Amino acid sequence: MYKRQVDIIGVTRNIAKFVIMVRDREMLAQRIKEAFYIARSGKPGPVLVDLPTDVMAELGSTSYPTEVNIRGYKPNKGVHVGQLKKAINLLEEAKKPMFLIGGGVNLARAQEEMTKLAEKIDAPVITTVMGRGAISTEHPLYIGNIGMHGSYAANKTADECDLMFSIGCRFNDRVTGEIKKFAPNAKIVHIDIESAAISRNVTVDIPIVADAKAAILKILEHTEPMKHEEWIAEVKGWDKEYPLHMEVEEGVNPQRIIETLNEVYADRDTVFTSDVGQHQMWASQYLKLDATHRLVQSGGLGTMGFGLPSAVGAQIGCPEKSVVSISGDGGFQMNMQELATAVCQELPLVNIVFNNNRLGMVRQMQELFFKKRYTITCLRYHKSCKGKCGTPGWVCPEYVPDFVKMAEAYGSKGYFVTSNDQLKDTILEAREYAEKNKKPVIVECMVAPDELVMPMIKGGASFEDIML
């Protein structure tokens, strides 16, 4: 046997929740049981189990254990009553409370409970990118995303509130911007299942280590209905004055793609997955999410190439649902070989590729913050290009690859969209083909090449520096 070896435990230790090598065949069942328990309990996360060749080759049988008792691993399941009472007191005293919801609420599957809490407290809800969908995006109390590409109203709400009640949020730099100026008028309650996440980035007034759903249920149990009509009206006024908007450019309008997906999949139980880049932010801004429409993305990890393979996993895990992958032309090429997996597994995925011939998000930052010094972001660039390329366009060298031909090479089908008028009919046709033939499809949309994702707050800046 050809022997290959790498310290996979060392390589993955910093990116997995837990890693272990099984050295004894007799311990295999116990370790597998522990791995699944650790992965699913507390803050969910990946667990790697390394199986040496001799352990896999050794014959034998072992009964699968029914219980797990891991020394030193006791995920918190309760809610500290004293801290909870302090948090509720702040809610009752606040004139301008708001909820900041992160991905922890979605992981806890507490969307219904979160909606009830927002309605009972009568407070506006803003979300991180990972928290979007924790309350329906069409709910009147939902304001939008906070942070670098969040809405004006959501960021203004955080800037003006007197109580920020955060659940399942890490307060990363894309959310806070300049920490000294973040939520300057607010007391902060932070509920998170991971104690290390509390006060790590933002110092909070009331820390509560608890599962999101358990904490929300306790708050619902111990609070009376409240009203904040003037505050809600003020927040709604900001949203009306500074709504998200679309620019009309050549090619396909990127925001229109997302709104077309909302229309086409309105009556479908759908999982959307997103790659990383401008398209991810447009998806986070414009997708309508609720109990039957979910968005899966890699959040702060920022992994280009995430869209297609995560869609494969979503479709295998949820065969009864429609699954749509949203990618850019750069990110899609990082894992496009997974089309072969989707074809072989007969998965009816619809892959939407935003093709602007750019690594768009990096190019946007080069344009806005680096005096348009464009470097390695034009995907039409050829070695033979002359001089410094400042404004690549449709007359540049031929784009590589041809996504339609690539789909055909994988035994699938591709579609090419060059105008907004083609969007709805093409996506409907692609979905019908995918479902009828049990094959993935690619819908390549030629996006306006210089469209920017707005609003935007520069990294390390604050709300007062927002660009609309």
Question: Whereabouts are the PLM-identified features?
Answer:
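A general structural motif
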Residues: K3, K74-K86, I146-G150, V252-N253, ...
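Thiamine diphosphate
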Residues: A153-N172, M281-M361
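N-terminal alpha/beta PP-like core and its mobile active-site loop of ThDP/TPP-dependent enzymes
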Residues: K3-M226, T260, V264, P348-N351, ...
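Glycine-rich beta-alpha junction loops
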Residues: L51-A57, G103-V105, S195, V276-Q280, ...
